[in-house]
Amino acid sequence: MRHVIFRVEKERYGLPLSAIREVVLPPATFSRVPRAPRAVVGVMNLRGRVVTVVELRELLHLSDASSPMQKVVLLDRGRRDLGLLVTEVDGIESVEKVSPPPGHPSPSVRGITRLRGLAVTILDPEGVDGAVAALFGHK
């Protein structure tokens, strides 16, 4: 199965290509959403559609760092537009085997794979969507 591989800081992540609508550059500024959870960067206008953008680093509870977030990965979620702010997109790769994640992983994590000797955490698009919905108190 083909996956979009991207980085959040130095960590590599992947999402199934079938779950991605497109990858775009972030706007110079996002429109802030009052009282939004910390992970919500804001909203952006993309060709007339309002897209909620979430900082994946914050959603996954990764440490704060200073690397600039340079890409927005847009999930194909039907009627709702959701963007994930990431450090960089590395490309599209074929992922053959995904091992179960160790310990008690987040529902956002499907498993772990290795590409060119490097670990890649494969995310579950439904789990990511659910984590974002939970930020707003939805189930």
Task: Please provide the spans of the model-predicted regions.
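An acidic, low-aromatic, low-complexity terminal/linker signal
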Residues: M1-K139
